[in-house]
């Protein structure tokens, strides 16, 4: 992904896309990337009506022309080099993946509510995904590091998050935070014994866990005082930390090859996404960039 050269921006014709559009302009200016704007549109056909191939092509053409007129206003304020395309399709996720590959996109931007199910998109998307919720340019970036990163995909995922956090924030003159949820000792050590033992294990676990997170952060040349840790489940703790730290953009990871089917600590990104009121950059292990 880094450095960014091409950002694919998905807009919905006739809808309020102001947040996504303005954010794409800000990201292009901050990173120097070129924008490719895609507007997937449904063919102009009544539901349940089966058209002959020629009429179907005409319906698709009419939908693309109508969307093209809608795009004219955006074209007037777009930076130099921006390209626009309206494509008639009944399968927007497939079209988005195809265009991301065609343009070799380094980042996909779209509104947080554009697709109800992100799994088909993330299964094949060749780049990270930024889900936009707000108009404001990000000023505070936070990376969500997962606990129990013993296996290779989880370790790489934490590296991906820290790498992007470290490189993106300076582009915007932004601040950095690293957020994490302290695992529940009762879940990790089910046979620990009495309450005293549980308390001892909890204290020891918190110290060990915090030190582990801080080491990952300092290994990337960042200060350990950027780390914020709270005890509890990630789907509860992370949204609370996002609110406390007034995070604008949360870097969130998924390790599942099939998208959101799995997430660190057994939690799903699907549980966290609806609970955070900020933009979210979704990263996967394959988004890691080897150091030059």
Question: Predicted regions span which residues?
Answer:
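Glycine-rich, Arg-bearing micro-motifs that act as flexible, cationic patches
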Residues: 107-124, 138, 249-275, 289
